[in-house]
């Protein structure tokens, strides 16, 4: 979960400095809280997926999918979400003054920041 930070962490250690990893609130948990939503319920599964790679197969997984760092490939990601008729919400810059929330694939802009994540939930049966 500390993927990007670990690159910096290793370099700091290699340069002879002391560094520690301190636990905190993950961005996808903060985004769900900002949306006043849980990520999963009961026996649902949670999948955290880097959106900068192929997501097509991953969106077939059952449960909730979190697409991390979705900004780079946003037009392709949006198109795929629309084609699959996914229930998707996006939080951009979670916890920052510039935080934005989008509540459907149609609302999500084609250009988004590095700090954009999309939560894809299965549609509930009525």
What are these regions (language model features)?
Residues 59-126:
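A contiguous loop/helix-start segment that scaffolds small-molecule binding in enzyme catalytic cores
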